[in-house]
A protein has these predicted regions:
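Residues within the helices of the helix-turn-helix
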Residues: 8, 19, 49
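A short, Lys/Arg-rich alpha-helix, primarily the initiator
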Residues: 1-14
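The alpha-helix within a helix-turn-helix
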Residues: 11, 22, 52
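DNA major-groove recognition helix of helix-turn-helix/homeodomain DNA-binding modules
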Residues: 44-62
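Recognition helix of helix-turn-helix/homeodomain-like DNA-binding domains
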Residues: 26-43
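Short, charged recognition helix plus adjacent turn
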Residues: 61-79
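Short, charged amphipathic recognition helices of the HTH superfamily
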Residues: 14-19, 45-46
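Conserved hydrophobic/aromatic packing and binding residues within compact polymer-binding modules
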Residues: 7, 21, 32-35
Length: 79
């Protein structure tokens, strides 16, 4: 699964709109939309840090980066 696809799954798992996620993380809404519409497939390191560093989304870091989940350590998958 591509990184941009994982980002959409995380947003959906949290029940957030694109705008809500962008407001929470500081990611530009048009940038986020370009990921979800697959116009932009490479996610910048800055955006990755905004997601993985946010308290609401830290639990997805291992899955986002390595396709692994360790629930006993608080690292889960949205699917």
């Amino acid at each position: 699964m591509e990184l941009f696809e994982k980002l959409k799954l995380i947003r959906q798992a949290e029940g957030l709109t694109q705008r809500e996620l962008c407001d929470a993380t500081g990611i530009n809404l048009s940038t986020w939309k370009s990921y979800e519409l697959q116009r932009r497939k490479e996610v910048s390191s800055l955006e990755l840090l905004k997601i993985t560093g946010h308290p609401q989304f830290k639990k997805y870091t291992l899955w986002l980066m390595c396709d692994e989940a360790v629930p006993e350590c608080g690292q889960i998958s949205p699917v």
